[in-house]
């Protein structure tokens, strides 16, 4: 069952032409357990997984014991709801539902991925964080972000002389809408991807967004 799911997943990735999304799955420590209908199953605690993810269909009687080294629990967040999930003592971030009314002000603040800067992402700082990453025109490496591998800043459609990625209002609205849709998919609609578990995954997601936005902006020029 798990093998079939992985085959489907990589076919989905290939169809969507977002190869980088595999980084959100490979290298993530989680346990996925498929439970068939009308069964009674006991899941023993995991010792090396960061959390346990279980798909539970209807008409199923299941007992799930707590994980011994869980960093956090993932909670389903309904639509049109802004909910903060407080991080546990061993977690370095909080997952926050992103509302539909994300606004951007002129008092733009550069986002730092230093883990000591903040232990949580709010919707607006998360939104600004990706924009700041994509708008980076310097020669920084991932070492500057507490990481080890070098990377090339993605600056295809962004201006270095302004805090806004693009000055045109129409394009700016398209970009904001795309951010909301993509982030909602990763954070709310699809709990199979443990996003923002670390900052390397965060930067990879930013690169995915940049690719999507480049296509959208080119089509609307």
Curated annotation (Swiss-Prot):
Keywords: Late protein, Repeat. Induction: Expressed in the late phase of the viral replicative cycle. Sequence repeats lie at residues 28-48, 49-69, 70-90, 91-112. Coiled coil: none annotated. Belongs to the asfivirus I196L family. This is Late protein I196L. The lineage of its organism: Viruses, Varidnaviria, Bamfordvirae, Nucleocytoviricota, Pokkesviricetes.
């Amino acid at each position: 069952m798990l093998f079939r799911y992985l085959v489907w997943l990589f076919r989905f990735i290939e169809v969507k032409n977002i190869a980088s999304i595999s980084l959100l799955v490979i290298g993530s420590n989680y346990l996925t357990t498929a439970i068939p209908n009308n069964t009674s199953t006991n899941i023993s605690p995991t010792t090396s997984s960061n959390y346990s993810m279980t798909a539970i269909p209807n008409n199923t009687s299941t007992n799930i014991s707590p994980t011994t080294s869980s960093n956090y629990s993932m909670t389903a967040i309904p639509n049109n709801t802004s909910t903060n999930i407080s991080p546990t003592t061993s977690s370095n971030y909080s997952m926050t539902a992103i509302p539909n009314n994300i606004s951007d002000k002129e008092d733009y603040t550069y986002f730092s991925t230093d883990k000591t800067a903040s232990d949580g992402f709010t919707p607006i700082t998360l939104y600004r964080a990706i924009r700041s990453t994509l708008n980076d025109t310097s020669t920084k490496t991932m070492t500057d972000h507490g990481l080890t591998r070098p990377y090339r800043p993605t600056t295809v459609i962004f201006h270095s002389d302004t805090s806004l990625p693009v000055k045109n209002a129409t394009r700016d609205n398209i970009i904001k809408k795309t951010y909301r849709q993509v982030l909602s998919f990763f954070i709310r609609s699809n709990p199979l991807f443990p996003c923002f578990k670390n900052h390397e995954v965060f930067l990879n997601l930013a690169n995915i967004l940049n690719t999507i936005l480049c296509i959208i902006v080119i089509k609307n020029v």
